[in-house]
């Protein structure tokens, strides 16, 4: 027999779980959030969310390693990224959630899978925050060629200031986040379009750059498409995966978006054009305008190009745009992890303090926790400023692939339940169905193998999983009892052990809402219910 929380302050996690008065057993995850994002903001977030440090900074070193073949690699990974996003889009129309694919993993595979996917996704964005802060610090030091003041600023100090300011802005409101991302994305898009316009002009009219005429002859004169061999070209794949990290952000924003059924499909359908124009198109132009050897590790290739054409002021302006891109990525990462941690906290998979939501609908504690890890980047920049970006980029890539795998697997399980008559698919559907999901899984497995061949950084990154996996196991057994206690009172839970697992149905009758659930009463009811798989 349960005790009223007023009489016994030592109530269990499940006793404190308030059952939502709705037929959506996961609606509790959305409590406290505001519908503060409109179509205008979401459209721009969908277009610009993944245009960040991976493209603006990482492309320089990738071109050095892979040469012109990098454009093909961007196209291939972009194709799989689009399949992943379409699968996520169908899941969103099934049930919009700020918990995104972590919430879907919970629904279709249970709490253990949600725990793993959630914390790996958090690790991804936490490391991305470090990469973005590092990139901005590198970008700022670039201005030292114009003013000694910037050259004298330590890289770690720039990273520290960037993290503090971005965290502070994220704590204000979702509406401010939406406005910041709208303008950040607009600046990035206009900058890339400007680069493409100037680049195409040089290409069409054969205007020399550093005394060399642009065109296909540049590729032939510099050892063709595989200047360093096939393997070096293939092992840059994990860096390109990092460049696409963020395309899944549209899932996190869905829980705070108005008119989801109309806005989400429209936003996702723009992605294929974004990939073709901004990613593949930009890299193709970079390869045709200058030899791949002209690009540098610690400098944006777009800045390198504008510096080479010699138009006064264009290179510094592009460098400011690049800083904006990195700030946008950092801003989006803090937004996303705050919502994911809130979803996990509600389910018991994250510390209870991560469920705190401010009056303005901001998950303050989750954002601050990610910000603290972002400060780890300050330490990394202090000790190894030269290697900081590459180290965290590879770790973040593993987290991105885990997120994509969770989306594909959740969509696959969702379609299986549709086939059993338990759900009805929306009109907006992922092309290829379960075949596309399997193709994505095979692709991700191949990327992991290629990452292992990238010695030493890629090899050591995968070796670090020997530390991460035991930590996840320890973490799960630490929170398992609390997670399962909460899950007992949530209808539609599909976990395997050791709690009830009534499969979700299209419609179910919901009893009159009660403030608290009597666990003793549930125990008696559960004896007559079939157990989960």
Question: Which role does the model predict for each range below?
Answer:
Residues 37-56, 61, 162-165, 219-280, ...:
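Hydrophobic, membrane-embedded alpha-helices of multi-pass small-molecule transporters
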Residues 195, 203, 391, 395-403, ...:
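A generic transmembrane alpha-helix motif of multi-pass inner-membrane proteins
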Residues 187-221, 284-289, 404-421, 479-484:
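Hydrophobic alpha-helical segments and their helix-loop junctions in multi-pass secondary transporters
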């Amino acid at each position: 027999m349960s005790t009223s929380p007023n009489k016994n302050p030592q109530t269990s996690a499940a006793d404190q779980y308030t059952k939502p008065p709705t037929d959506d057993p996961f609606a509790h995850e959305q409590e406290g959030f505001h519908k503060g994002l409109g179509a205008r903001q979401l459209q721009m977030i969908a277009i610009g969310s993944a245009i960040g440090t991976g493209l603006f900074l990482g492309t320089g070193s990738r071109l050095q390693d892979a040469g012109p073949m990098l454009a093909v690699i961007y196209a291939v990974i972009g194709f799989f990224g689009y399949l992943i996003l379409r699968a996520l889009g169908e899941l969103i129309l099934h049930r919009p959630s700020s918990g995104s694919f972590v919430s879907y993993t919970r629904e279709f595979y249970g709490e253990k899978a949600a725990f793993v996917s959630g914390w790996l996704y958090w690790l991804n964005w936490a490391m991305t925050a470090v990469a973005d802060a590092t990139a901005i610090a590198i970008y700022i030091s670039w201005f030292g060629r114009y003013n000694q003041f910037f050259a004298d600023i330590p890289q770690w100090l720039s990273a520290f200031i960037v993290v503090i300011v971005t965290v502070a802005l994220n704590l204000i409101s979702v509406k401010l986040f939406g406005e910041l991302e709208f303008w950040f994305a607009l600046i990035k898009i206009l900058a890339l379009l400007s680069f493409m316009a100037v680049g195409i002009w040089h290409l069409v009219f054969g205007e020399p750059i550093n005394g060399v005429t642009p065109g296909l002859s540049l590729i032939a004169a510099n050892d063709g498409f595989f200047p360093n061999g096939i393997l070096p070209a293939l092992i840059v794949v994990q860096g390109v995966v990092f460049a696409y990290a963020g395309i899944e952000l549209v899932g996190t924003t869905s829980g705070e978006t108005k008119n989801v059924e109309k806005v989400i499909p429209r936003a996702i359908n723009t992605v294929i054009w974004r990939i073709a124009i901004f990613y593949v198109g930009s890299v193709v132009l970079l390869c045709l305008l200058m030899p791949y050897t002209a690009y540098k590790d610690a400098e944006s290739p777009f800045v390198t190009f504008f510096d080479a054409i010699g138009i006064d002021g264009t290179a510094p302006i592009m460098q400011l745009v690049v800083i904006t891109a990195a700030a946008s990525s950092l801003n989006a990462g803090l937004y996303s992890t705050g919502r994911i941690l809130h979803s996990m906290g509600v389910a018991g998979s994250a510390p209870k303090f991560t469920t705190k939501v401010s009056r303005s609908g901001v998950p303050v504690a989750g954002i601050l926790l990610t910000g603290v890890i972002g400060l780890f980047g300050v330490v990394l920049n202090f000790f190894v400023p030269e290697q900081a970006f590459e180290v965290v980029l590879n770790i973040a890539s593993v987290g991105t692939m885990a997120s994509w795998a969770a989306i594909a697997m959740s969509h696959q399980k969702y379609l299986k339940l549709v086939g059993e008559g338990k759900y009805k698919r929306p009109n907006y559907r992922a092309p290829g169905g379960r075949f596309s999901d399997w193709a994505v899984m095979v692709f991700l497995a191949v990327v992991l193998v290629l990452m292992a061949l990238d010695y030493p950084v890629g090899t050591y990154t995968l070796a670090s999983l020997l530390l991460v996996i035991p930590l996840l196991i320890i973490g799960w057994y630490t929170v398992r009892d609390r997670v399962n206690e909460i899950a007992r009172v949530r209808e539609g839970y599909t976990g395997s052990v050791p709690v009830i697992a009534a499969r979700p149905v299209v419609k179910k009758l919901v009893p009159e809402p009660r403030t608290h659930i009597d666990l003793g009463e549930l125990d008696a009811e559960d004896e007559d219910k079939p157990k989960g798989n």
